[in-house]
Amino acid sequence: MPHLGHSTCLAQRVYGEAMAHIDVTRNGPYAVHGLPLIRLRLQPDDASGSQDWVERAPIDTSGEADAGGTYWLCRCGQSQNKPFCDGSHRTAGFDGTETAARGTHRARAKVMEGESAEGVGVVVRDVRPLCAHAGFCVADGSDVWHMVRGDDSEVHAAMRDMVDHCPSGALTRAGRPDAAHDDEPRLPLRVAVCDNAQYLVTGGASVASDDGTAYEVRNRVSLCRCGASKNKPFCDGSHADPDVAFTDS
């Protein structure tokens, strides 16, 4: 269990008795409160070119947690006890400075609109800096940005599913541009360790900066765990860069 040297912030979301939130610590790990931890891996479908998440075993956090159940996840990518922090950020001189923008997804999003031949509308919002490059937005030689502009209802249905699988929440969708809320999939409240990739945080858990201010609460976000993202604390796909070559081993 790492010695953080400072108190956790107040940003939190309450689900029953659990305070489900994540604190980004200064140049250190993520302090995770009230969230179960599991493993996920990407399973490609060679026939269709699509992919999906396959849930692996839950991760026991009891040996890493303090008396209150808080556990610490590695953020520098150097831990020898991944996904947990082992203090390597100190010896590695990890610079975990947060560079992500603080505006809301809607305020920052590029908006694309489409309508099927049957008159069913669809709106896709896209915030590129949040993209974790997981690849759910491309399949069968096409992509979300082209599919939304067509009028084929089956293509639109496939596109909606692709958007719903976006792990970073860079892509969202709605039926109308003036809809009060996006149409979000129902996701479990948890943190998922994605094989050789990001932490996928779902279900509306809040994430707070090391200065105590909260980022916008989202249904799904991807947090960097390789230490190389240029959009910290969020994943930008740097783990897949050959110069980073992040692995769980």
Description of each model-found segment:
Residues 82-92, 132-150, 163-177, 232-243:
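Iron-sulfur cluster-binding cysteine motifs and their immediate structural context
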Residues 96-116, 152-168, 185-200, 246-249:
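Short microdomains enriched in Cys/His and/or Lys/Arg
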Residues 26, 59-75, 111-133, 143-161, ...:
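Ferredoxin-like iron-sulfur electron-transfer modules
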Residues 10-36, 40-42, 181-193, 202-204:
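Short helix-coil boundary/hinge micro-motifs
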Residues 21-34, 39, 98-135:
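Ferredoxin-type iron-sulfur electron-transfer modules and their immediate structural context
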Residues 75, 81-82, 90-99:
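Hydrophobic, ordered structural segments
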Residues 35, 240-249:
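Intrinsically disordered, low-complexity serine/proline/glycine/threonine-rich regulatory regions
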Residues 30-32, 71-74, 83-85, 171, ...:
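Short, structured motif recognition centered on aromatic/hydrophobic residues
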